[in-house]
Swiss-Prot record:
It is a multi-pass membrane protein. Its main location: membrane. It comes from Danio rerio. Subunit of the oligosaccharyl transferase (OST) complex that catalyzes the initial transfer of a defined glycan (Glc(3)Man(9)GlcNAc(2) in eukaryotes) from the lipid carrier dolichol-pyrophosphate to an asparagine residue within an Asn-X-Ser/Thr consensus motif in nascent polypeptide chains, the first step in protein N-glycosylation. N-glycosylation occurs cotranslationally and the complex associates with the Sec61 complex at the channel-forming translocon complex that mediates protein translocation across the endoplasmic reticulum (ER). All subunits are required for a maximal enzyme activity. This is Dolichyl-diphosphooligosaccharide--protein glycosyltransferase subunit TMEM258. GO terms for molecular function: oligosaccharyltransferase complex binding. GO terms for cellular component: cytoplasm; endoplasmic reticulum membrane; membrane; oligosaccharyltransferase complex.
Length: 79
């Protein structure tokens, strides 16, 4: 395989939007994280729903995970 015949890889996400994605994703993740903590503190053991807890925690962790991923890309740690 010749080097000249290869096509250069381009990222599907423009590096100029890494800061915006970081802030938006982390903000959404922090919202769901705060909602989870408020739900845990204000509900009694009789009114808690484990499926609702798992759903909120899953959504929060997904947004926080992708937010941290784009934060690392933003600061130059390419993972």
């Amino acid at each position: 395989m010749e080097l000249e015949a290869m096509t250069r890889y381009t990222s599907p996400v423009n590096p100029a939007v890494f800061p915006h994605l970081t802030v938006v994703l982390l903000a959404i993740g922090m919202f769901f994280k705060a909602w989870f903590f408020v739900y845990e503190v204000t509900s009694t053991k009789y009114t808690r729903d484990v499926y609702k807890e798992l759903l909120i925690a899953l959504v929060a962790s997904l947004f926080m995970g992708f937010g941290v991923h784009f934060l690392l890309l933003w600061v130059g740690i390419f993972v």
